[in-house]
């Protein structure tokens, strides 16, 4: 019948109509998302108008490229801190606003907030994830809180005390190399390279109880650590390689994977062996064997293996590896940067260098061998003041990134809207003339007890502050005191003819290295 033919719709037409409806629905959904994002963006821009900003390069780039990773960029950061003395707005391209804070009172709501309110922004840290995993540096939320609680005992005084002997041993090896080079006429030394190897040597001994002899002969593991750090810096400077599927198809990406595998395999092997020992010996016998060992100390790995939360649950091998790799990453470059700049500042101020040297001489008078002990660390007040003043002038990490998960109210009543990225400028705070008079002058007396009481605790934050402060800061300060004290005892540190140009990367470096001249001191001089 004809009407049956007419009503029997063509199957192709039905399919076409269905696809049209699906496409229309998808287009409507996309349009709705675009409109919602546009509304949210415009509302956010409106709320950010209360914050001052410097002129943009143009509408598309925003402030990208204004502050470069070189000496001129560092000077511009200082100038901006003098112009905007609390907070100002920058734009990364046309749509990414970033608030930069340079005043202690203004960073307080961020640094003192619970970790969930102002977690780290991982936009520029995700390159580290394949290497460091979910260690303290990159994790967040409940996992971070649990790991922080479990790792805190690893940095207790009882654990840190025996490490001082390890610091002495490592710096003695470095100084022996320096004296040999000086005898050969090579008194001009690059600090970062030498000190990085020394800090890695110490870390490997404290972390794994393993002596790689890396300061005197090549170590595959140490070479991989150094290569990973170098490759991450290189990748961060190439925007088109931010995408993983592109990066891992490059030669650098393949080298990064290979170095990651090598580091992970080494750490995994140590964990497996320690867990086997712990399982076969039992906790009591394992601890007793440690006290009878030559080092008489628990390594960092041992503490993590023994750690249990309130429910009696241990860290997994993957968790332990992540924390061990994080400790290696966070403990070698930052301390090497700090030590290099400390020696540079003392070289430029021989009067302070000499006063530090006299303090060390008095402390170690008639002591054989010349070794800094645990109790000595509290007996070096002026040297400690010089270390802190150098950390103020040249903080190893110049910025902290936070992303607000809720509105943050500032002291003057202005509000940082939820979802925005904040840069807590450690360098900006440390060079803010409202906080530090004559901020470019090296003056250790800023840190005497009287002056210290006049300032906010957040005016000096080389190790960050608040819930997410650096868990290893006491370890780092102890190592710095040992290295600086013994270096000044054995060498006169002199500035190079060429003034270094600062270069901020993951840590604060110097273009072409930081070069100083070392003059060995004779026993008679001492």
Curated annotation (Swiss-Prot):
Membrane topology, as annotated: Peripheral membrane protein
InterPro entries in the cross-refs: Cyt_P450 (IPR001128), Cyt_P450_CS (IPR017972), Cyt_P450_E_grp-IV (IPR002403), Cyt_P450_sf (IPR036396), Cytochrome_P450_Monoox (IPR050196)
Binding site for heme: 470
Cofactor: heme
E.C. designation(s): 1.14.14.1
Family membership noted in the UniProt record: Belongs to the cytochrome P450 family.
Name listed for the protein in its UniProt record: Cytochrome P450 4F5
């Amino acid at each position: 019948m004809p009407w049956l033919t007419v009503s029997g719709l063509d199957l192709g037409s039905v399919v076409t109509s269905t696809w049209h409806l699906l496409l229309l629905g998808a287009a409507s959904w996309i349009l709705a998302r675009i409109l919602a994002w546009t509304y949210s963006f415009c509302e956010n821009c409106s709320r950010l108008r209360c914050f001052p900003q410097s002129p943009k390069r143009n509408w598309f780039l925003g402030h990208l490229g204004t502050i470069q990773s070189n000496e001129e960029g560092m000077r511009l950061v200082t100038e901006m801190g003098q112009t905007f003395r609390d907070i100002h707005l920058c734009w990364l391209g046309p749509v990414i606003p970033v608030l930069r804070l340079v005043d202690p009172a203004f960073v307080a709501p961020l640094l003192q907030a619970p970790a969930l309110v102002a977690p780290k922004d991982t936009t520029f840290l995700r390159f580290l994830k394949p290497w460091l995993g979910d260690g303290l540096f990159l994790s967040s939320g409940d996992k971070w809180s649990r790991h922080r609680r479990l790792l805190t005992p690893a940095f207790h005084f009882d654990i840190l005390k025996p490490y001082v002997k390890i610091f002495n041993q490592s710096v003695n090896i470095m100084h022996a190399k320096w004296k040999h080079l000086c005898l050969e006429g090579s008194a001009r030394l690059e600090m970062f390279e030498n000190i990085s190897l020394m800090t890695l040597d110490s870390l490997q001994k404290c972390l794994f109880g393993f002596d790689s002899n890396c300061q005197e002969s090549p170590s595959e593991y140490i070479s991989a650590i150094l290569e990973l750090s170098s490759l991450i810096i290189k990748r961060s400077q190439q925007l088109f390689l931010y995408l993983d599927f592109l990066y891992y198809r490059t030669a650098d990406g393949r080298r990064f994977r290979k170095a990651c595998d090598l580091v992970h395999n080494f750490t995994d092997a140590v964990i497996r062996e320690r867990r086997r020992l712990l399982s076969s010996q039992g906790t009591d016998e394992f601890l007793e064997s440690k006290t009878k060992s030559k080092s008489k100390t628990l390594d960092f790995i041992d503490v993590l293996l023994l750690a249990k939360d309130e429910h009696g649950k241990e860290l997994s091998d993957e968790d332990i590896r992540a924390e061990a790799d994080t400790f290696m990453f966070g403990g070698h470059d930052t301390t090497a940067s700090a030590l290099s700049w400390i020696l540079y500042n003392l070289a430029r101020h021989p009067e302070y260098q000499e006063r530090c040297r006299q303090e060390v001489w008095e402390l170690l008078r008639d002591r054989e061998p010349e070794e800094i002990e645990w109790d000595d660390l509290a007996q070096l007040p002026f040297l400690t003041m010089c270390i802190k003043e150098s950390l103020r002038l040249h903080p190893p990490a110049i910025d902290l990134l936070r992303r607000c998960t809720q509105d943050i109210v500032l002291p003057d009543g202005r509000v940082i809207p939820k979802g925005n990225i904040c840069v807590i400028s450690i360098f900006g705070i440390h060079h803010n003339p409202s906080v530090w008079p004559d901020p470019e002058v090296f003056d250790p007396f800023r840190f005497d007890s009287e002056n210290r009481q006049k300032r906010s605790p957040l005016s000096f934050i080389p190790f960050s502050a608040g819930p997410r402060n650096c868990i290893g800061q006491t370890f780092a300060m102890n190592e710095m005191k040992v290295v600086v004290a013994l270096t000044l005892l054995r060498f006169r540190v002199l500035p190079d003819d060429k003034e270094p140009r600062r270069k901020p990367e993951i840590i604060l470096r110097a273009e072409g290295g930081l070069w100083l001249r070392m003059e060995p001191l004779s026993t008679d001089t001492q």
